[in-house]
Amino acid sequence: MSPRIGVMLSGRYRLHRLIATGGMGQVWEAVDSRLGRRVAVKVLKGEFSSDPEFIERFRAEARTTAMLNHPGIASVHDYGESHMDGEGRTAYLVMELVNGEPLNSVLKRTGRLSLRHALDMLEQTGRALQIAHAAGLVHRDVKPGNILITPTGQVKITDFGIAKAVDAAPVTQTGMVMGTAQYIAPEQALGHDATPASDVYSLGVIGYEVVSGKRPFTGDGALTVAMKHIKEPPPPLPADLPPNVRELIEITLVKNPGMRYPSGGLFAEAVAAVRAGHRPPRPNQTPSSGRASPTTIPSSTQARAAVACGTKTPAPRRSRPSTSGNRPPPARNTFSSGQRALLWAAGMLGALAIIIAVLIVINSYAGNEQHQPPTPTVTDTGTPPATKTLSGFPAAYCEYRVNWTNHKEISNSGLPKQAARAQLAGATDISPVAGQT
């Protein structure tokens, strides 16, 4: 039987008002009869109460969130399983009742946040996530609906319902996607393990939305949106935003998780630098592994691709001296003075042709570049700075896009089969009840 007003759970928590409903359960305002305080009680939906997997996930949420103690994380007070009107056991989670409003509701009213409030919210959220990341936990469903804003501007992260300990066995099936499509990291959309960098990506999507008033990726369905996170670059942010703010969001939304800020704390430090008027620091990037291939002369198409991605053509390898026995030196070719003159002229013409071709390529890209705002690129730590990208986004995106779009698990039909069957809309979406505040 579904919970209703007046129901008492375990002889202690009396349900008073339905606040919100979501994929896994309902959130109620309740009264703790022992301590005389108001609390929030998340009650698992009746259709899931007999499902051992959902019960275990619900217990995991209680254990996970109870480990975290920070002003920016809604506290967990209790967990229990109670008979409800003799209709079987129902699991519930007792949490801090936050006097606040979900960020998604704020955005529905205001469209976007002021830059000052947006950066403050992002820094607070990053610092709160760092507590989980330092404990080896990943939220995996960071989105505006899980960020509460109090009247004083304090951020409270809620709903660690699909959080997972990095070193523990996953509750979900291998390859199953957990998260909300509009804010999901590319690696999560592919069914790969989420990391703290996945939470940072989701927070970057939120950052894009709060400063621009729109999400970077939209579509007709969850799968369409998820595929855009995997394959497409975000649209350029409004030109009226400060360059360091645009750079911060662009760094955070690169496809390669190894090239993002690796934790909420480092993301928060980057936001703090931007708030102080500085450029965001570059994350410690994990360069792609691989052996260098033999040097070849690139075609004109390859050369243009290299310029667009901010890469440099590798220098030709020097020939190694032979270690074999002494060999007689090759016979010298002798040329007449006329032949030498012809060879010299041919060499000059060849060099001139190369110079002209290079100038044509440079001029063509310079013409294109005039219409795009200059954006500093992200480079690997310890390597020379990359050349400026022409897309307006860091070179890391252009470099890694090929790896993601050619991933062995991606087919022409889209996501992996298991991922496509998963509920990309999120298992723990929380939607306020109509008429409730």
From Swiss-Prot:
Residues 1-341 are cytoplasmic. Autophosphorylated. Residues 285-303 have a biased composition (Polar residues). Residues 363-437 are extracellular. CDD domains: STKc_PknB_like. The chain crosses the membrane at residues 342-362. InterPro entries: Kinase-like_dom_sf, Prot_kinase_dom, Ser/Thr_kinase_AS. It comes from the Bacteria. GO terms for cellular component: plasma membrane. Pfam families: Pkinase. The active site is at 141 (proton acceptor). Residues 13-272 form the Protein kinase domain. Keywords: ATP-binding, Cell membrane, Kinase, Membrane, Nucleotide-binding, Phosphoprotein, Serine/threonine-protein kinase, Transferase, Transmembrane, Transmembrane helix. It is found in: Cell membrane. ATP binds at residues 19-27, 42. Belongs to the protein kinase superfamily. Ser/Thr protein kinase family. Protein kinase that regulates many aspects of mycobacterial physiology. Is a key component of a signal transduction pathway that regulates cell growth, cell shape and cell division via phosphorylation of target proteins. This is Serine/threonine-protein kinase PknA. It comes from Mycobacterium leprae (strain TN). The gene is pknA.
